[in-house]
Amino acid sequence: FETEAAGSRTCARKVTEMGREADLVLSADYTVVDDLLIPDHADWNIQFARNAMVIAYTDDAKYAEEINADNWYEVLTRGDVAYGHSEPDADPCGYRTLMVWQLAEMHYDEPGLYDKLDAMCPPENVRPKSVELIVLLESGDMDYAFEYRSVAVQHGLKFLELPEEINLSMVEHAGFYQQATVELSGTEPGSKATKTGKPIVYGITLLKDAPHREAALAFVSFLIGPDGQAIMARQGQPPIIPATCPQKGILPDLLKDAVQ
């Protein structure tokens, strides 16, 4: 069993553009599977977990004792604070960060906040995937990073919970989230695609040419079953119980009973 980590969009492109052989693709945004892998490389997409955007930091971060859910954007835009996020074109956490900033501008009624946050986050603070920011936090080279809650929990970091209206965690706020949009590279070279804000939902799919199909399906069965769900919950990642799949009718028999 081997894993290879990258931003979800990068993972999908390794399959579609580089011909990378793999059994499964797990994405932190289920729509990456829908947009980039189905129908040419995969047939179905199981939605199995949720998450929330948070601001991760350590005790050594500037103003760590002061930052809270009401003043975080004021703290971050002080000239001596370094903050970062992952690359939007490579990693859903990156474009979700930009969505959080847009939603924050509306939620806090702070015109120009998105542009200010964007301008004060230099290119060197934008990394290919969100977990790379952890090293910068732990070394003290970065004060704050926009991360998934599960990543902060798993790395033992402090983190600031953002309001539900902007943290992309709640289906109840889906209508508000939709007001945020980010332009990304499209499926064809030089093309563009627009991502719209949605609650964070993770997806998993089996590739059509999976070389180890039965073992891969056994892993999916474990992941969306009680044991896998319990592990996710302990690691700060709420499972979707039961998992859902729009293509349930074509799922392998092993998975059908575990999916709604």
PLM region descriptions:
Residues 1-3:
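Short alpha-helix C-terminal cap/hinge motif
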